[in-house]
Amino acid sequence: MDGLPGRALGAACLLLLAAGWLGPEAWGSPTPPPSPAAPPPPPPPGALGGSQDTCTSCGGFRRPEELGRLDGDFLEAVKRHILNRLQMRGRPNITHAVPKAAMVTALRKLHAGKVREDGRVEIPHLDGHASPGADGQERVSEIISFAETDGLASSRVRLYFFISNEGNQNLFVVQASLWLYLKLLPYVLEKGSRRKVRVKVYFQEPGHGDRWDVVEKRVDLKRSGWHTLPLTEAIQALFERGERRLNLDVQCDGCQELAVVPVFVDPGEESHRPFVVVQARLVDSRHRIRKRGLECDGRTNLCCRQQFFIDFRLIGWSDWIIAPTGYYGNYCEGSCPAYLAGVPGSASSFHTAVVNQYRMRGLNPGTVNSCCIPTKLSTMSMLYFDDEYNIVKRDVPNMIVEECGCA
């Protein structure tokens, strides 16, 4: 399949398939179905890799004069698919960005990521391809939340964090930590000795405004640096009550005497702003049926997988999706002879959903023949900002078409 006409005609089928992924809400307001009375003109030679039956069998064929509009429709369908998989109603409204220095520090600490010369973040395994080993039953999310402050005068420093619980899912917190930077000021010490302080973090019990629990850690300091304190129980309790705001009071015993300064929310120290890291998992009990499929190589007319890459910069999403830089919105195309029909598993249920959509739109389902559709979908890792400016690292299931079949 070469050139824009081929890609756009293939996109006609994918538009229908994407709507099937998203469910009824993806269709928007009802529009009249295409008339099945007159057969469409044949596509340009080679436009679909050899078979005009591909899209007519799926009910998604469009005439050449409609192809320009269809590309835009296709991209909108892909956007809705991504937001649906992230359980978001719309893209976040990024009115003010998290300070770049703070974000870069957190990413380097947690992911060994790097910032390229063009300012884009590059992180191993977040390249838009399927995540290695991510198709198992266990789905893991990683959430990074940066500290804010109420500015209250107190002997303690009060910080708070808005921590997303990923669409109110039943998440189990595997590990959660507060990262705090301790800065050493000039101070005369005996040779070989270290500054020893005790950091205490008081966290407010959800639902009990007057009750505080504490975690503490003894720290021996030789130089300025980052230190972590465990908050697993505090954040698990927060999630269980359906709350998002985590209030912390931080004390440092011995810091003043030994010229140790914990860095909190300081405009002059953005790269050392405290942050909380939450690793949580959601167990998915569903099993996938694995099937082998064909790759579209220009030599086959049968149902196959066509690779298609979407750069997030080109659709205006690079301001809230940190990594990957784009999405492999692969799709299925090709003919489905009778001997290839009836692929079991996810294909059958998918085809049922598509036919039901056509029933609601008034199209006779008897005219819908066997269709080339995804039979295996894989997970993709994403790093993005949510509505609360948390950085979320999430393995998102059913994002990338890996194999295609007929049903």
Curated annotation (Swiss-Prot):
The keyword Hydrolase does not apply. Keywords: Cleavage on pair of basic residues, Disulfide bond, Glycoprotein, Growth factor, Hormone, Secreted, Signal. Pfam families: TGF_beta (PF00019), TGFb_propeptide (PF00688). GO terms for molecular function: cytokine activity; growth factor activity; hormone activity; protein homodimerization activity. GO terms for biological process: activin receptor signaling pathway; cellular response to insulin stimulus; cellular response to starvation; fat cell differentiation; negative regulation of follicle-stimulating hormone secretion; negative regulation of hepatocyte growth factor production; negative regulation of insulin secretion; positive regulation of follicle-stimulating hormone secretion. One of its GO terms (cellular component) is perinuclear region of cytoplasm. SMART domains: TGFB (SM00204). Glycans are attached at N93. It is found in: Secreted. Residues 30-46 have a biased composition (Pro residues). Disulfide bonds join C296-C304, C303-C372, C332-C404, C336-C406. Dimeric, linked by one or more disulfide bonds. Inhibin B is a dimer of alpha and beta-B. Activin B is a homodimer of beta-B. Activin AB is a dimer of beta-A and beta-B. Interacts with FST and FSTL3. Belongs to the TGF-beta family. Inhibins and activins inhibit and activate, respectively, the secretion of follitropin by the pituitary gland. Inhibins/activins are involved in regulating a number of diverse functions such as hypothalamic and pituitary hormone secretion, gonadal hormone secretion, germ cell development and maturation, erythroid differentiation, insulin secretion, nerve cell survival, embryonic axial development or bone growth, depending on their subunit composition. Inhibins appear to oppose the functions of activins. Activin B is a dimer of alpha and beta-B that plays a role in several essential biological processes including embryonic development, stem cell maintenance and differentiation, haematopoiesis, cell proliferation and wound healing. Signals through type I receptor ACVR1C, abundantly expressed in pancreatic beta cells, and type II receptors like ACVR2A. Upon ligand binding, these receptors phosphorylate intracellular signaling mediators SMAD2 and SMAD3, which form a complex with SMAD4, translocate to the nucleus, and regulate gene expression. This is Inhibin beta B chain. It comes from Sus scrofa.
